[in-house]
Amino acid sequence: MSELRDTRLEKARTLEELGQGPYALTFSPSHRMAELQVTHADLPKGEERDVSVSVAGRVMTRRVMGKLAFFTLADETGSIQLFLEKAGLEAQQEGWFKQITSLVDSGDWLGVSGTLRRTDRGELSVKVSDWRMLTKALQPLPDKWHGLADVEKRYRQRYLDLVVSPDSRETFRRRARLVSGIRRWLDQRDFLEIETPVLQSEPGGADARPFETHHNALDLPLTLRIATELHLKRLVVGGFERVYELGRIFRNEGVSTRHNPEFTSVEIYQAYSDYVGMMELTEQMVSAVCEEVCGTTTITYQGTEIDLAPPWRRATMHELVQDATGLDFNGFSSREEAAAAMTAKGLHAPELADSVGRLLNEAFEQAVETTLIQPTFVTDYPVEISPLARPHRSKPGLVERFELFIVGREHANAFSELTDPVDQRQRLEAQQARKAAGDLEAQGLDEDFVMALEVGMPPTGGLGIGIDRLVMLLTDCPSIRDVIAFPLLRPESRKGEPPSVE
């Protein structure tokens, strides 16, 4: 590899000596590749069109055949063949054919001008009359046919992955369209996006361990946000009846194919709504954005057809667990009774699950979650695991909460929001006690948030959707690292250590 780099460095010096320069300042292409292909699709084989064009892009392949050469030049929209003829180039400037064929390598950025012709094989080509080196690449590209076989290298050197993989480029185009589609859908319905703090003195809104940092000037310990929930609710208190934020969240947790410590979510709050209203919003928005991005609401994920057309299935957590295990958690009077019944069914009942409600959630995660392939709203969660949700209007011990599962993964989480400040304080104090006892993921007591609730928050529905997992679904990607341009990876110097997997 070092010999190839040295050779390319020498070519860069030669270009400098010839007055070309290996790194141009600007170039003004007249067309992009896709535009040329569409506009001149009617050009017959073997014919030329006396139309002057200029294009720019990266040289992907090159073939030199005596007095002829053929390069493939690619920009973001597509590619086109360059037809280089010694006689034509030498007529423009002596030595040009030799220079372009000997000094230009695959990977270089090139700007060319010329006319159009279609080869006898039907390939639309630019017959080059003028060329300019835009950037001399010192490193070679991966093999054209095999790309980056090393999956980890694709993540570490995403720029190479994007150069050689049209599928990777399309994944990130779809991600961008999905994000803009969600914002557009919400904006058209009078939701207002407002940015909330990333640095916080009291993290809240989720059960998660935060990243910690320190503000030197104020001598103040801070954390990166683990959710946007509590600040968005403050905005509802302040009078913004439809508000959302789409942005980055940070949780100091393990990594897996479904988890990255830095990820993207959208949280949405709507006054005068509840969790039923947020179910309707979720299925309408996700299906609409899916159709916009994919052209259909029926997609295939890892070989399984998924139908995202509303309405989606709705089922309570109790119903799903009872159907899967035969256990009726409504009939258990103590934690010990529930744990014994779970053990008899071959389910694990961890000591940290210290109530019937927490054990119900454990049974759901072990026996049900991965079976929910088609879109399913799982509703009515135990109050113990939902400290920010409103008590259920008719089911004691439960809250008005749902999670959306597709292909066995959680994609969204929503509540009828808790607006009673006295109840909220009691629940956060219980969380604070768990935190003091060593639960690193328990929430603390945010006094200012409770004060905001005392000012008064109207009935509100709240929703959070994981953007990365939704992109995985719509791009048929098996790992979250495939849809995050630059995922967090262990330093190469520590690659031999066992992975930290959640």
From Swiss-Prot:
GO terms for cellular component: cytosol. It is found in: Cytoplasm. It is an enzyme of class 6 (ligase). Mg(2+) 2 binds at residue 410. Its EC number is 6.1.1.6. GO terms for molecular function: ATP binding; lysine-tRNA ligase activity; magnesium ion binding; tRNA binding. It catalyses: tRNA(Lys) + L-lysine + ATP = L-lysyl-tRNA(Lys) + AMP + diphosphate. Mg(2+) 1 binds at residues 403, 410. One of its GO terms (biological process) is lysyl-tRNA aminoacylation. Binds 3 Mg(2+) ions per subunit. Its cofactor is Mg(2+). This is Lysine--tRNA ligase. It comes from Synechococcus sp. (strain CC9605). The gene is lysS.
